[in-house]
A protein has these predicted regions:
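Bacterial Sec-dependent N-terminal signal peptides
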Residues: 1-32
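N-terminal "domain-start" segment that seeds a small globular fold
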Residues: 27-62
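Short active-site neighborhood of thiol/selenol oxidoreductases, capturing the structured segment around
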Residues: 62-83, 192
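Loop/turn elements at helix/coil->beta-strand transitions in domains of secreted/extracellular proteins
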Residues: 67-70, 98-103, 129-134, 152
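Second-shell loop/turn segments in exported
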Residues: 77-78, 108-113, 177-181
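Structural microenvironment flanking redox-active thiols in thiol-disulfide oxidoreductases
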Residues: 83-128, 139-146
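Short, internal strand/loop/helix patches
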Residues: 123-164
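Thiol-/selenol-based redox modules, centered on thioredoxin-like
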Residues: 157-217
Length: 217
């Protein structure tokens, strides 16, 4: 009986050891997965892409030979936050395109998850609102994870440096999605203005407020 108790205690201890070590392995895998989806940080080089525009043509950052940088905005059709910002995004492009910082809008959502964000709907929305900038579709959802975009809208201000597109600002367009008249902090504008003046960007990162990116399950 004594030997049986010893065997049982050893068995229980072994089970406890297994239950203790397995979560540690799972947690490590989880952290690696999160890290792999982290995306760009300020100071990183943003790699170029080639995505389809609403006119059917393929667009890359390298197509904009005279650009000094870019205001890359991940946005979409259906999201109430994105809709609130549409007019402001148009104004950003009108204000800064001539100064070398055009807006490049990218729809990261899977249309099978959110049909309102389909390609044809993008064409119709751009025409309705009078978009003055490229509105690209992230087919296969390969670009938004590289950037680390998690919301629509989510802004990445880039500056050309020695032939590379360097991330200078990440986050929200401003600090009031609901009413442009109540905005007190113009994050994206301030970042671009600083770059135009040759000054460092003071606020390099803010929290993007919007709808989550709709990913195919």
């Amino acid at each position: 009986m004594k030997n049986m108790k010893i065997v049982m205690m050893a068995f229980i201890a072994a089970l406890g050891l297994l239950s203790f070590t397995k979560p540690s392995h799972d947690n490590t895998l989880q952290k690696e997965s999160i890290s792999s989806k982290k995306g760009y940080e300020v100071g990183d080089e943003a790699t170029d892409f080639k995505l389809k525009n609403i006119d059917g043509k393929m667009v890359s950052l390298s197509d904009f030979k005279s650009a000094k940088g870019f205001i890359v905005i991940f946005t979409c059709n259906h999201c109430p936050y994105a809709k609130k910002y549409e007019d402001r995004i148009i104004e950003l492009d009108k204000k800064y395109k001539a100064q070398g910082y055009p807006v490049i809008a990218i729809n990261p959502n899977d249309p099978n998850v959110q049909p309102e964000d389909g390609y044809q709907q993008m064409i119709e929305r751009a025409k309705q609102k009078g978009f003055t900038f490229p509105y690209l579709v992230d087919e296969g959802q390969k670009i938004y994870p590289q950037y680390g975009a998690t919301k629509t809208p989510h802004v990445f201000v880039l500056q050309k440096e020695n032939g590379k597109n360097i991330v200078k600002y990440i986050g929200a367009i401003d600090n009031n999605y609901d009413n442009p008249n109540d905005v007190s902090e113009y994050y994206a504008q301030d970042a671009v203005n600083a770059l135009i003046k040759g000054e460092p960007v003071k606020m390099t990162k803010t929290v993007a407020i919007g709808c989550t990116v709709k990913v195919k399950k």
